[in-house]
Each structure stands twice: as structure tokens, then as C-alpha cells.
UniProtKB/Swiss-Prot annotation:
<comment type="similarity">
    <text>Belongs to the asfivirus G1340L family.</text>
</comment>
<comment type="function">
    <text>Putative initation factor.</text>
</comment>
<dbReference type="GO" id="GO:0044423">
    <property type="term" value="C:virion component"/>
</dbReference>
<protein>
    <recommendedName>
        <fullName>Early transcription factor large subunit homolog</fullName>
    </recommendedName>
</protein>
<keyword id="KW-0805">Transcription regulation</keyword>
<keyword id="KW-0804">Transcription</keyword>
<keyword id="KW-0946">Virion</keyword>
Amino acid sequence: MDFQNDFLTNPLRVTLYNPAENEYTKTFIFLGSVPANVLQACRKDLQRTPKDKEILQNFYGEDWEKKLSQYVVGGDGDDLDEFEKLFVEDSGEETNVMMPEIETMYSEYSIFPEDTFKDIREKIYVATGIPPYRQHIFFFQNNTLQVTYRLLLSGSGVALDIRDYKKEFQQVGGLNIDASMESQKDELYVEALDSFQLIKNIHHIFVADLNTLVAPMRRQISIAIEDNYQFDLLYYGLIMKYWPLLSPDAFKLLVQSPLQMEKQYPALSPSLTSLKKRLLLEQKLINFTYARAQQVIAKYEGNRLTRGTLAVTSAMIKISPLVNIQINVRNVFDLFPATPDIPQLVVFFYSKTGPTVVSKHHITSTEPEKFSNKTFRVPTIILIRFINKKAFILTIQNNGHYFIESNWSENERHDFNSVVSTLNNFINPIIHTINDMGPAAFPRGGSLPLPSNEDIQISISSMSVSTFWPYTLSSKGFTELKSRWREYEQAGIISVRGLQQTGVYNFLFKKGIYSYDPHEIERMIIISSGPGRKMDINVALLQNTYAYLFDTNVAARWETIYGGRNIRIYHRVTDIKIEMFNITQEEFNYLWVYLFVFLDNLITGPDKILVNKLSQLHDKQQGKGASQLRALQEQDPDLYDLRKYDTQATVYSVLCQHPRPPVIYSEAEVKSMPPAKRKELVKYWNFTEGVPAYYSCPHPDYPHLSLLEGRHPLNYCLPCCQKTKALLGTKRFYINNTCLTKHTFVEQDLEDLNTQTSRHTLSYGKKIPVNRIAFLPHQIADELFLNTIKEPDIFCIVGVEQTMLGISNAGLFYSLARILDLAPKALAIEIAKAANTPQYYILGNGAGNMFSSGAELASLILQTFVEQKNQLLQWDTTWQDIFLDLVAICYDLHCVFFKDKQGDFEFEVSPNTIQKILSPSKKIAIIFDTDEGIYPMAITQQKRFLKNSEAQYIFTEDDPVMEVIQSMSEFMCKDNWWDIHDVKNIPGYTVGKKLINRHNFCYALLIDSDTDRPIYFPIRLSSYIHDDIPIDFDLRPTQIASFKETWKFITLFNKQYKQYEIIPSAVLQNIKKEFVGFLSEGKTGLYFYYAPTQTLPAALEKLPIATLTIDPRDIDQAILYPLEEPYPQQNKANKAFYINHLYKFLLIEFFDVLYGLQSNTTRKHIENLFQKTDFQKITSVTEFYTKLSDFVDLNDIHTIKHILETTDAEHALKVLQKNIFNFDYTLLSPLQSYTYDELCQHLKKLLTPRIEFYEDIETIDRGLINIYTSCQYSTLNQPQCEKKRLRIPVNHFENYIHILAADILNPLKHSTLLLTGLGVIDDLQFILRPQEIISVKNKF
């Protein structure tokens, strides 16, 4: 890494320019801290001796005369994208020329590469006496005149060349002005860029002093500005144009009372004495940094970027295509489904109702409020993807630029390369999916480039990075560290805010930080309130972002946004940790040098402070409790930071109190220890680094290392020192041995231990460790289940795991695994197989409807319970119901629950389980749901359980316990409807099928008899059991028995089951006047259907007739299945809708043809011009841009310049051909030269090849899709397209051609026509998939 100050050997020259006389008056050369003989030789100017010239040549090089001359030299164009770049047409002045000899002054103030142009203004002030507000700075770069701000008029850049001052012929107060600016003053906007650009490679700048204009004309100006109109002409036509640092009030003060400027506007005119003092201190400190930089880099470079000393904890990668890409983010959002993998999406676009934000999320996720509430500047889509519970955020703008960001744990030790690699792997499949959308996403063609493509620029920003200085300081040493930063604060290099924490030094590093978003200051939030009135919140749009120099409110916000990068230095026992927040990779390299030069100075030089090198820490002694705990947490945070994994966990300092925490050593430290001391250590494990660690217990009262089990959320064993040594054969000895061998202590270890050591059963009400048992509460065991078992059998609750990663209430899952005697993962795999079924939606009484398919549900089960990759989020409340159903399906096992409500027990059983319990074949398990967790109930003998964990968990029909459960279920069963099995008792009839709805309830039976068609027999929604009667999840069948057969069965049923008598109350008639059924009496009247008949059955003649406008079956079918044969009415609606939108479809084809014709013509001009240009010659380049301006606008010239500056000549032409320019959108102008009749003929000629003609469109078999594209390139199945051409009736085509010609010739219709390029019928209509939730909000 190179860290040099080029301005020491190639100094900055500042030439003063007088616009009134159009002449250069004086040059200041900033030599900086050069040797005395160099300074002396420079100042001799024309009297230099040969010896002086030799000194200057040795110091500045062979071209020393050029560096110290009046020669105008620009930089190489690096990193100046933010400045207003203006193509300089033939100005008559070469940019690289010798100016007439003028006076030269030499300044000893240093210029540094990290100086912003704001810093340069201050240094010009101390050297020349011209305060910042009077400076108009300009310079040349790549033959381009540039200034340090941007002036926009109605959103377009204004040319700013102060050398044109004398060309303005209108005057106010004796000063030349641009009068057009005043008439459009409300449309002016100034964007200050001084703070967002470094001087870097610029070595010659020019300054026009406002005083050269104002001072001679002060009297005339004072008189003129008394008139408001003349004041506005002068301010907007001159001051705001060239000296925008001045507000109107500040300008007025400058004219009337210039000596008051420093008092009234200290930011515009700072105290010269204070500024000189600060800059000299800054110079001293920065010179010291540069002097030591290479030495420090060489000392630490080997470890600077390694995983051990660097940890990126958050980052954003920006991918910038070299070519412009038009991407329809609204359509990408619509076509991209929300899934458990990518559960959240947000889009911002301009809809028919204005700026609009739409968000959607998968039902297993939450609404992305954090992203939908953001402030957007351009149409943007945000996609959030989860991989192993880590969120990756992809933001794509409509110009093809996209950003990838994520966060990591410091312990993962990601460096820059691994961050880029990780984010690239995340992004690639999403980019492929978007690119496959074709014209729907890319209406002008093209695709998003992958991060690996050559046609892109990649930058890393918004990083949070931790780095480590491998030395440790005492408390006094860390205090000294803080005090030494005060000089940097006085020099303005850093800023210290607020209170400081013990052991942490927090400050903002300001110097050289410039990678901010200049637009963030634009919107000012103004809050006002007062007694007796509500708080008012207003958003003010700044017209001039230099307002931070003359408005205290803006200044406060400016300092908040642009005040520097947050740096935290942590005093640690083992090293010094430095955290840097929201930085770029370039800033990291720069800040690292400053910080490590500072830190290294603590241990080198005459004023070094006492430190202990990390490699010499083998002689650690037991320190104070806080420092000892900190050392443990610093070296192995995964082990000692328990709340990292569980916010409710007890902290280590409570589990192992002072003076019991041990001392930890690394392998490197152990190798340097004396053999005798090495023998005292216990080898264990560093969970953070994944390497061995060694422990000792130096405190004499607690000399023996012990390992605590069951306290860490991940079951890691925690070291802690004890008074006595664990004896062989004891429980503690077994735990220590297991922990030292396996590093964890888990369920099976506890089972093994309990088998050896546990001899008693716990009382009910306590938390039950895994594989321990507790007695049932007496009111259940001794009252409810009285006399159901005999001694020595006992009722008990068995302890099982209650949590897993991502699930806080996993007790039911582990209880089911224990009951079925399965490994938990084996259970999850089996029920996942069962979930992957077409009828997945019935699970959990319809909870399965949350998922788009059984495969998706199965995948989520595996990810959550086997791979443990997903957090359940909203599914967390429903997975238990789904699991209970799946266990019933897989193992024919049903569960009943006793829920402990503060000592009162509630018996809970699902309707399906009741049906099972009341059936002849039954198999149940009993589960207790308590405040401490969910546990299975069992019958066992204590000695038998202690020996081999044997117990009975499942109860069947002959078990006495089942009798109790059955009687309780019968009591709870309040269903007064008949039992399905009773139908079997009606001679000649059997239940052929049970019809089940999507909520897993039985709603009807199909009764078989000796007829061909079944009798449709509805029942109240009821639970059902899986028995020998088939079940059917489809719709009500259309082929059913006649009224005669149906009524015959109902008559027999009423006779046999008088308590359930079916009494018709109304006849059902459809719109065809057919009688199709009847409605029965009662609160829950049921719809009985039979085969349609034209004759009213005699048994129903006296009943009222109820007309079914739509058969409920048709509604169900429309919801669940696409219509195979649309209704005639639907055909008519589709056709009408098609005709209404046919003109929009024709416009899409028209613009697609026009894009190709217009763009290809202009591109050929550019290509020919490109091939004729020698880009190595300035005159040839100037001619290239001059001719280019004849047929493209200024913005396109900027784009072409950028491509040429960032791409080699051979590759540039390919990039130009792919790019989208402004000229691609100026399509209609050439057509306006036609007459109406000529244009109609021309349009016919253009569009006929794109049309598939029809005499008429008789039928449209399906509705139009909301997103449409040109039929020529469509990747969507569009009903308006055939053979890649647009279907149009012949009689409509002629009419549309005339309408299109009239619209083209009407200038008021231009914007309306261009908007059709969106390719959306209704931009607020979105595809709504079953598992998605969409919300829309307008942003004003």
C-alpha cells in the first residue's frame, strides 16, 4: 500500500483571476513543509543560481520548472464524477499553455491528497486573505472546465464559465448579470460539492475573487439592491451563479457592511488567526503520519488484511454497469414471487396515482416495513433473501445499478475478498431469474450484468470493520491514548461528541472523508411547537445546499450527516480493538494508516508509554474481576457471550463469580512458557477460532478447573475454577471428562449421566431436565386416573428438549419424537415426506393454505427442524397444529393435552381426535403443556426408567387410561348431529365417500345404493377419522341421484333417526329454471342437491322457491381451478377488454419499431465518428466532441465521456453500442415533419409487418395478462399475440393508424404516448399468489 503526499514534490498552484479584466493576476504555490534550502531556492524566482536550480531539480525532478511555472496543467480525471463537467467548445484558449508572467507567491502551508475542496478554500484564505465566500474556484481536467458545485435549472445543468462574465451585456449596479436566471429563480438549485471531492490529482486551480467586482462598484451596488427586483437580478444572475456560498442576506451584508461578515457569518468568514493556528497543527500531525506511514505499513502489513486481524461486519457492494440499462422494476416486482427463501420485496415506482411504494411478503415472514418506509429517489426494487438465517439485501435501480448488502458476526472474520465472494454467490441466482423475464423487465433490451462481468465497476461501501492492534495497555496507558487524540481534535482531524464509556474511546474521523451522498441534505425536517398547540412537522426542500454555511438549522443537520466516520477504540485485556463504521474500502486503507501510526507512536519514540506485547502474555496473573472476564470474552466471545445466542441467558459473570474465572492462553503463548508452567494448564477449546485453548486457575483458593454444563444456549461447557478437585466416579468428574473430550454436554450425555447418578423423581412444577422424570400433579394422578394403574407403576412427565435454533417452543416436537421412539431429525424427515401431498392445504385445519405447495411446506419443515436454517417467524404459531395432523397421518397417533393454567388444568382435544377416540380403533398420547415447557406423559417404574428409560407413552383401546380419556371426550363432544357410522344401519345404503373441504372438515357424504349415481347428503361441518371410508377433496360431483332416489333415502333416514329429522324449508332453482335441490330447516340449514329437473317435485310443491343466481359449486371451481370452457359472457368481456386496450398494444409495437430505426441511425453516426478519431491527440478529441454535440445532447456527451474514460478504446465501441442514451427517447420529433396523410402512409408501412390481421376476433379464450410487451420479443404467453405478431381486426387497424398519426402531430400528446412504454394495463394491479401478502402506499 502506497501512502505518499504527491503535493510535496508536485505542489498545488492557485492562480487568481480577475473576471472584470479577464486576466490572471497572481499565483500562489503551496510548497508545504519542504527543506529550508528548497524553500529558499523557490523564493529566489528569477534570481536563482545554478546551485538553486540543482537543489530544485533534486527535490522536484527533471520537470521542476514546469511544476513551479504558470503552466496550466489538469489532472487525470480520477474521481471527479460529482463535479459539473462542461464540454469546452472552441474557446480560443488552450488549457495546457504558458500564461504571461505574473507575480508568484510561495506558501509553506501543506496540501495533502486527503484535502477536500472545502479544505482548499480555507488554505487559500490563509495564503491569500480571500475568505471562502468570495472564492469562485475553477480548474481544467481532461480539457474540461470544472467548478466545485452544480447549478441546476429545472433539473438541467447550467454552464458555468466565469471567463464569460464580460460577455453578459445587461448590468445592474455596474455588474454584468445573466437576467434569464432571475425569471426562473424558483427553478434554480445549487448542490454544494466541495465536501465530497478530494483535491487528489489536481495541481493547478483558479480563483475568481468576488471583491474584484464588488469593491469598485460598492456604491452603485448599494443603491441598486434597495430595489427588490434589481437585487434579485443581481443575486440570481451573478452571485448565485458564481458565488453560491452567499445567501441573499449575506450578500447584502457584504455590500453594505463587509467588516461585519466574520461576526455575522463565522462559517463563511472564519477567524483568520484561529484558522492559521488550526491548519499549522493539522500540518504537523499529518506530516508526522506521512513520515511514519511506510515504516508502520511495513511493520504491520503482513497481518493488516488477514482474517486474524480484520473482520468486516457489514458491507454494501455497488455494481455499476458501464452501459445504461432500462429496467422496469415494477414488472420485476410483480413477476418475482415471494418465497420462504426470498420472503420480502419492496418496489418504488411512479404509478397513475403518483409516487408509490408496494411491498409484499411471504406468509412465513413479516412485512418489510423498514424498507417500505425508506426515501427513494429513483424507481427501485428491494429483495431480501435469507441464507442460514442471515439476511442479504439486493437493491436494484431502474438504470441497472444495483447494491448488495449484509451483516456478519465479527467472529466470522470476513475479509474484503470473502465479503465480495459471499455477496456474489448470493446475487447470481436472482440476477439470472430477472434476466429470464426478458422484455417484461427490460423493455429496451439488455440484461443485468453479473458481478463477474467485465462491463461493470465494483465498489465496496457502507462497511463496518474491526481491526486489532496486537498490544495491550494499562488503564493509565489507555487514558494517555485518549489524551493524545486531543491534538487531533484541535486540528479538526477528528471530532469528539458526548460522554465516553469506560474502556472505549469514541470519535468521528473527519479529515479526508468525502464519500457521502450529497443529496441526503436536500430534505430538511423542520419541527416547531409551542404552548397550547400541537407539534408541527414540515419538510423543506433546500434550494441551496451551501445553506449549512449561513443557516444554523441546516448546519446542525449537515454536521449530523457529514460529520465524519465513527471510530471506536476498545481497551481490551489482550489487544486494542478498533471499529470503523460506514466506511468505504478506500477509507479503510486511509484510516488504518492514521490509526496505526498513532498507535505505534505509543510504543516507539521518546514519549512512548509502557505496554505489554501480546506475545509476552504468558506471565498473565489473576487480575481484577472485570478485566479477567473481559479477557475471556475477547479471546472466545462465542463461549463467554451467552446472550449472543439467547437474550434471556444468565451472564457468565453470574455463573462464575470473581475470583473463580480462569485464565485463557493460546497455543502460541503456551509454546513460549517454561515446561513446569505448561504442566499446570488444562487443554480445552476456543469455540470462536476453532482451535485448542489452554486454561489455568491461578487463584490459590480456587486452583482446580471445572466445566459447567447446561448453562450455554449451544450446550458448550463453561470453564470455571473450583476449590476442590472432582473425585473419580462422581457426577462432576463425569461431566468434566465429557466436556474436555467433546467440548459440549448434550441430551445423550445427560441421559448417560442420569443413568449413573440420578436416583429420584422430581416434584411436579419444576423445570424437568432432559431424560429426568417428574410426578404428575395429584389431581390428575390420584383423582382423574385413580385406580388405572397398579404399583410399582407410576404416572410421570418425561423431560425433553424445549428449544432449538430458531424455535423457542420446540417442546412438542421433542415430545412427539420421544413418544414415537424416534430421533428428532428422523421424525422431521418422515413428516416432511407426508406433507408433500396434493392435499397439504388441509393440514392444521387449513393452516397448510399458507404455503403454495406441499413441496414448499416439506422444504420448510426440513430447513427448520433438520437443517435448522430458518426461523419460523409467522409460522411459529401454526406449526404445532400441522405437526399433530402429520403425526396422525403417518403413525395413526392422536394427542390430547392437559394445559396447566396456574394450577387449574384444562383438557384440550381437537374435534378430529375426538372422532378417533370415539371410534373402535384408537391410539393416543397424552401431553402436558406447562409454564416450564411441553412434556409427554408416561407410565413407568422408577427403577426401570433409571436403568433403561423404559416407559409407556401410547395408550390404546383396552387401556384403563383410555376409558378416562374417552369419557372426557364424550362429555366434550357437543355435536348433536348423527354419527357417520349410523348410516350403515340403513338397509341397502352405504357411505361411499366423505367429501372434505380445504379446512379439513367433512361437509357431505356420498351415499351408495343400487342406483348408478350417488346420493348427495350434506352434514354440518364435522371432524372425521381416517377409516375404511374413502375421502374426496374435490368439488361436489355434478352426476348425482335424482330427487326421487334422494327423497327415498331421506324418508328412511327420518324414520330411523327422528331426532335428526330433515325437513325441507325452500326449493332451490337455478337460472335455467331447473329445480336442483332444497334447503332444510334449522339454524344451520343445509343445502341438499339432486339431479336438475324441469318439474317441481310433488313433495316440495308447497314450499317457497329460492333462486340460485350462481351455483356455489361454480364459485368454488372458479377459485380452485381455471375455467377450461369460459362462459359466453366471459368471452364477451374478454373481447371488449381486448378491443379497449388494442391501441396500447399497437403503440408498444410502434415504439419498438421506432427505437430500432432512430437508435441505429444515431449509433452509426457515433460509430463513424469514433473510428475517425485519434484519442491520443487533444485536437482530434476536441473535434470529436464538437461534432458529437451536433446530434446528441449534453447528458449523452457526459455518458460517452465516462465510457471513454473508464474503458479502453477497443472495448469502448462495444459498450457504446449496448448503452441506452437520451437520443433513444427522442423518437417522435422526426415524424412531425410529415403531413397527416404522409404520416398515415408511413405508419402503415412501418407497422404492417408487425400485424397478424383478422376479419374479426370472434372469441378470446382467456383474459389479458396485466403486463404486456412487444409480440416480437415477448417471453410471456400473451393472448393478443400470434406468430410473434399483434392480432388486430382489419377494420380496427385503419382507425388506429389515423388516431396514432393525429397523436404524433399533437405536441400535447407526446408524454402520454411515451408513458405507454411501461407495458402495464393497470400499474396498481399485481399478481397475488396464495402465499403472498401485498400492501400499497402512496409516497408524497
